[in-house]
Amino acid sequence: MSEAVPLSTRRASSAGDAPGRAPVLDIDSLDMEARGVGRVVDENGEPGKVIFVEGALPGERVTYSSFRRKPTYEQAQVVDILRPSVMRTQPKCAFFGTCGGCSMQHLDMRAQVAIKQRVLEDNLWHLAKLRAEAMFAPIHGPSWGYRYRARLTVRHVAKKGGVLVGFHEKKSSYVADMTSCEVLPPHVSAMLVPLRRLVEQLSIRDRMPQIELAVGARVTALVLRVLEPINAADEALLREFADTHRVQFWLQPKGPDTVAPFYPLDAQLDYTLPEFGIRMPFKPTDFTQVNHQINRVLVGRALRLLAPERGDRVLDLFCGIGNFTLPLARLAREVVGIEGSDALTARALENAKENGVDGHTSFACRNLFEVTADDLRALGAFDKFLVDPPREGALAVSKALAEIAQSGAGPLPARIVYVSCNPSTLARDAGLLVHEAGYRLKGAGVVNMFPHTSHVESIALFERD
């Protein structure tokens, strides 16, 4: 059972915005940034400004302090909770509220997932006038220690006593003074203070703005963004730290293409998809899902929805390093993966060979944000599509499918599984697929890839007769 915040001894007052008092507000809902939303009512009972209150939950009565005022709304921070919600729980992290890494630790996990499901449904309806024929059961898993990828900012702050390593403070460019993190794997959380001490000793302490974290099944990699070369003393310190904490250091002197392993050289990052007998090597700068446990469940769900058969030809768009392509190749006759990055395309090809499915796969590098109907026709007929775009969505792909459907010139897949990390672009693309390409939205559901944040990942199934 969730631990509720003790009831405040202060009482709500109808004169809540009298001089010297913090105004009182009843919270009706949460927005997409996990802020409580309420509306001021004037003395005549007429609705007034909308107030977005950080730290407030639906059903609560709170006092608040506004830090930004606009003609139709205000942004505020909660001051006191006069009537707490049954959904409120005690945050696990000592730095919650200051650190910007999480925004929902004060909200019960079941309520977090329910709110994300509502955000998905609201986006589909308000942006595309769509309701899914079925809402899938949410995909969820461990809510702590799940974040296998992270970008940590490094900054020397004399007033704070030295080097800080961590996420930014909430809505700030400052680095949170954090000594642990509940959503990072425990061994990484325990490394934050030693990392601060390490950077403090380096000659390039003030020329190393960030550390990129990537955790694999057996290896933890730390990519140091170095604006100046390291010296021999730095090298010795890095080697000692790597041996002590069992990590691998990579150095990035310029752009992403300059990333190279420093020490040890023989370690290899990978993750596995045991259900399909897949081992997926990757580099720390490759795109991989943040939450490995949820990714396994997501891949299984996506393939069951797509239901590839032995004779099927499947197109995997935005395929990355082959996260869906390789499992699909275990089940279908042929899978074609298209990706916009040359490096990821090459890695997908290597991974297909590593897993013995190169005979059932082929890969190509294309700009999928500019793909046309003619481009899709040139690829030939496919029985099914899997689409897993970045936050920008798959607008060009959706438009191309709509054009093919309306012209009647070219084959269309009977089934599309769309994995999304942005409910608004999913809704936009779903509108095109349903209203212009003739598909039905058979089902949709949320994937709680990022517990304790407002980030909404989702999956949707489209079918066409």
UniProtKB/Swiss-Prot annotation:
[4Fe-4S] cluster binds at C93, C99, C102, C181. Keywords: 4Fe-4S, Iron, Iron-sulfur, Metal-binding, Methyltransferase, rRNA processing, S-adenosyl-L-methionine, Transferase. The keyword Methyltransferase applies. Residues 16-80 form the TRAM domain. One of its GO terms (molecular function) is RNA binding. It is an enzyme of class 2 (transferase). Its EC number is 2.1.1.190. Residues 1-24 are annotated as: Disordered. S-adenosyl-L-methionine binds at Q289, F318, N323, E339, N367, D388. It holds the Pfam family tRNA_U5-meth_tr. PANTHER family: 23S RRNA (URACIL(1939)-C(5))-METHYLTRANSFERASE RLMD (PTHR11061:SF49), RNA M5U METHYLTRANSFERASE (PTHR11061). This is 23S rRNA (uracil(1939)-C(5))-methyltransferase RlmD. CDD domains: AdoMet_MTases (cd02440). GO terms for biological process: rRNA base methylation. The active site is at C421 (nucleophile). Catalyzes the formation of 5-methyl-uridine at position 1939 (m5U1939) in 23S rRNA. Belongs to the class I-like SAM-binding methyltransferase superfamily. RNA M5U methyltransferase family. RlmD subfamily. It catalyses: uridine(1939) in 23S rRNA + S-adenosyl-L-methionine = 5-methyluridine(1939) in 23S rRNA + S-adenosyl-L-homocysteine + H(+).
